[in-house]
Amino acid sequence: MIVRSFKEFEGTDRHVKSASGTWESTRIVLAKEKVGFSVHETILYAGTETSMWYANHIEAVVCTKGDAELTDRETGKTYHITPGTMYLLDGHERHTLKVKEDFHCICVFNPPVTGREDHDENGVYPLLTEEV
């Protein structure tokens, strides 16, 4: 059993800030825990727009605080995301989050991330593996 406090992650490599400056993420459960998924608490900043495409991962997201507009770039459909709303990127959809109010969310990834990932020029997380 693993029990952790978010305070344990402050100032560690599990607290990641994006190169784009649009988000920060606390990586709570990672590939090295060997449970088949990873869990993150992520904050996307108000007034930012982040384009993403998880070509190598499935992601489930639950909004816990804030306000954002999610656009599926493949269909053009837009969704209003507020606390209590979830979305699942089960088809590797290219999507954009336009953040109106700091957007706090819990994200689950499969396959799990290692914690070192950041979006590349296409919005993709590379498929990294944990060395044994």
Curated annotation (Swiss-Prot):
Example GO BP: ectoine biosynthetic process
Gene: ectC
Keywords recorded for this protein, A-Z: Lyase
Enzyme class: lyase
Signal sequence, renumbered to the chain: none
HAMAP family listed in its UniProt record: Ectoine_synth (MF_01255)
Disulfide bond positions: none
Gene source species: Streptomyces coelicolor (strain ATCC BAA-471 / A3(2) / M145)
Annotated metabolic or biological route of this protein: Amine and polyamine biosynthesis; ectoine biosynthesis; L-ectoine from L-aspartate 4-semialdehyde: step 3/3
Protein name listed in UniProt: L-ectoine synthase
